[in-house]
């Protein structure tokens, strides 16, 4: 798939996402009005990306920004802690300042990047950056949060800035969630969902899928709980065993196939809910979308990385512009080597080919 073909496919995928979001927010006039407004913004963003494509630079539609290396939870098997993104001696140093993040957000809008996924660590620990994102009205910021800090002033921030979309992390029902995230976390998240729903906010949940919880998180019981809580977006993320002794939790090829089948059934069963699967949906887009094909990752310290699960970089946003980061020779090597745009059979491609990835930096 050429970059131009990928651009067309990504644009079509985003259009379907917007259409599905309109369906999901049909009973919520405020949310629907926001989606209709953003629909026009996204069309303008597509034109900007097409202009760059014509001049020889492929601009991804998405960014993933880990805005802090701090977190208030210690979740079992956390990729951010294992990769040094979050609260360890391997962290890259100081986090980017709010002014540096503002510049990144502004530059991203100018280049036509439509979505910026804010992660961490726990992103709500960087209130200054969240406020900065709220001011960037021409971009949608899904905020991937553990949910435990989403109360009081933060509720008001999300109410007043619809471009910030809370995405709360769950591992399944109470037993699965509290086992990985800590006692009492599930109840806190359920309370937050109730409050978000009362405020008529569009929000979602992110579910890390393992061999232990796969059947639970695709069950009717789990989905009914989310429906009653007002959740309209479910993002399934296949577990990546960054910690070697957790390899047994990673989905097999058969598990991935069964997960895909289960999600297809859920999409038909719950038409007013949006279901996304990562990296499962990538196989329909000619391979892994990392390294700037569809997205890239910015670490808390500013490293431009192909993917959160592959924390290797040759450029840092404290030294280069966002455009220069996108034009990274390392990213180009990843794409031209076939590591990201080859056949995608499921699972995290770059994590599985870690040695090949590191060799490209030599």
Where are these regions (language model features)?
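Radical SAM enzyme [4Fe-4S]-AdoMet core and its adjacent flexible, acidic
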Residues: 1-10, 169, 178-291, 300-305, ...
């Amino acid at each position: 798939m050429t970059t131009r073909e990928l651009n067309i496919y990504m644009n079509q995928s985003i259009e379907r996402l917007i259409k599905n979001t309109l369906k999901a927010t049909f009973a919520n006039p405020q949310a629907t009005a926001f989606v209709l407004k953003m629909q026009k913004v996204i069309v303008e963003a597509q034109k900007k990306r097409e202009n760059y494509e014509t001049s020889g630079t492929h601009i991804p539609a998405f960014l993933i920004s880990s805005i802090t290396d701090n977190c208030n939870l210690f979740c079992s098997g956390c990729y951010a802690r294992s990769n040094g993104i979050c609260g360890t001696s391997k962290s890259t140093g100081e986090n980017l300042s709010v002014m540096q993040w503002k510049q990144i957000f502004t530059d991203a809008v100018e280049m036509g990047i439509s979505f910026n996924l804010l992660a961490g660590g726990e992103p709500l620990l960087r209130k200054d950056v969240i406020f900065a994102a709220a001011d960037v009205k021409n971009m949608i910021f899904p905020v991937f949060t553990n949910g435990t800090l989403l109360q009081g002033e933060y509720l008001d921030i999300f109410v007043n800035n619809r471009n910030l979309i809370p995405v709360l992390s769950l591992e399944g029902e109470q037993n699965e969630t509290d086992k990985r995230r800590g006692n009492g976390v599930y109840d806190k998240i359920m309370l937050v969902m109730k409050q978000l729903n009362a405020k008529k906010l569009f929000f979602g949940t992110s579910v890390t899928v393992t061999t232990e919880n796969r059947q639970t998180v695709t069950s009717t019981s789990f989905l009914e709980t989310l429906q009653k809580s007002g959740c309209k977006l479910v993002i399934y993320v296949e577990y990546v065993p960054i910690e070697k002794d957790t390899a047994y939790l990673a989905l097999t090829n058969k598990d991935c196939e069964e997960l895909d089948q289960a999600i297809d059934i859920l999409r038909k069963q719950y038409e007013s809910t949006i279901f996304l699967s990562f990296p499962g949906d990538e196989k329909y887009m000619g391979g892994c979308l990392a390294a700037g094909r569809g997205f890239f990752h910015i670490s808390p310290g500013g490293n431009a990385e192909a993917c959160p699960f592959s924390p290797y970089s040759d450029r840092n946003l404290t030294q280069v512009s966002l455009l220069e980061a996108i034009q990274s020779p390392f990213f180009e090597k990843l794409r031209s080597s076939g590591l990201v745009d080859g056949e995608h059979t499921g699972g995290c491609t770059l994590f599985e080919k870690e040695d090949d990835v590191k060799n490209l930096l030599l």
